[in-house]
């Protein structure tokens, strides 16, 4: 599966806006906030953001895949990365390269 960079940015922005302090953002709440992406795209993106240490997630492996239950937090590195890609005009320049 291909990593959708716009989905990556949007997941981080939505997580930042909707994650409560000392709480989590369930996948069931995240999906409706990102209507432009499929469940598979969002799940894959969350797994890759976790792999890159930008998000901490709660996940459950099952035969044939992994289920993402919740986003637990944006890591410090995730916040730093998000600050670098937050500006829409800068983001457009980055993804055009």
Question: Which residues fall in each region the model found?
Answer:
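Glycine-/proline-rich flexible loop or hinge segments
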Residues: 29, 58-59
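Non-catalytic, well-ordered alpha-helical scaffold segments
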Residues: 5-9, 40-43, 52, 72, ...
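Generic structural signal for hydrophobic core residues of well-folded globular domains
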Residues: 15-18, 49, 82-85
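Short amphipathic alpha-helical interaction segments
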Residues: 35-57, 68-69
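Solvent-exposed edge beta-strands and adjacent loop segments
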Residues: 60-65
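Amphipathic alpha-helical interaction segments
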Residues: 22, 53-57, 85-89
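Short amphipathic alpha-helical interface segments
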Residues: 2-34
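Short, amphipathic alpha-helical interaction segments positioned at domain boundaries
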Residues: 66-97
């Amino acid at each position: 599966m291909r990593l959708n960079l716009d989905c990556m940015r949007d997941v981080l922005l939505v997580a930042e806006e909707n994650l409560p302090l000392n709480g989590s953002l369930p996948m069931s709440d995240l999906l409706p906030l990102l209507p432009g992406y499929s469940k598979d795209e969002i799940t894959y993106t969350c797994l890759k953001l976790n792999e890159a240490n930008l998000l901490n997630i709660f996940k459950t492996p099952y035969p044939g895949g992994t289920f993402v239950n919740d986003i637990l937090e944006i890591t410090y590195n995730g916040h730093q990365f998000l600050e670098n890609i937050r500006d829409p005009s800068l983001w457009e320049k980055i993804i055009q390269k």
